[in-house]
Amino acid sequence: MSTMMKTSILLLVAVMLGSSDAQNYSKKVWDLVATYNGCYNNSERLSENFTKHFAVNVIVKPVLALAMGPGPQMYIEVSELRTRVELRQFIILSDGGENVVKVKPYHFTGWDKYGPGQFDTDKFATYTKDDFWTDPSWECELEAIANGIFFGGWPVTTHKGVNGTRLTWGCIFLCDQASVTIPAGGDEVRDVVPYYYKRTCPKFPLINPPADYVSPCDQKLCPCGKS
């Protein structure tokens, strides 16, 4: 059996086994997966002469590594100038307090071996728990402040600040846009003006959402700046 066929079968099994657990997660968790989803870049803002900003590309997509449980999972990749990966994480989401989603990032086998856009997320179907690792300082929370709008800090897990502390990007996620504020002390270009991104590709399909789930990005009342 070829590796591609084996991976396809494992993905199908993962979807079948995970579907019954979709109801165990609140709508706000699924809303985050649906909201922060797709390919993004800041090319529009760069065209407005924001010379202190790098050209940044972001990929965020739902994934499923059955070894890590059946719940909502995400893959995020942030790259600069299409040459250097600034951030690459496997994410497990869970319910926090009221209107809060807990975010637990992991690194994984091969996370630092691929260039921008080169990692095949189907590989997660073949990974075991031993292929993933995390640190308590990487965990964060995002708050659903409105329908289709999330706010919070996102941990930079690839490096620490100049004083050895964990860096956190300040983030706002909308259905088709995102903004990121870069903290002082990192090796990124620091600017008081946040990085603004717009989605440039169709959203990726959700994996095992509840049968009656409706994304806030599909609702006419979503105040999320659809473009």
Q: In which residue ranges do the predicted regions lie?
A:
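N-terminal secretory signal peptides that target proteins for export/translocation
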Residues: 1-3
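Calycin-type beta-barrel ligand-binding domains and close structural analogs
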Residues: 6, 23-55, 63-66, 73-227
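Conserved ATP-binding subdomain of kinase catalytic cores across diverse folds
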Residues: 59
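Cleavable N-terminal signal peptides of Sec/SRP-targeted secreted and luminal proteins
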Residues: 5-22
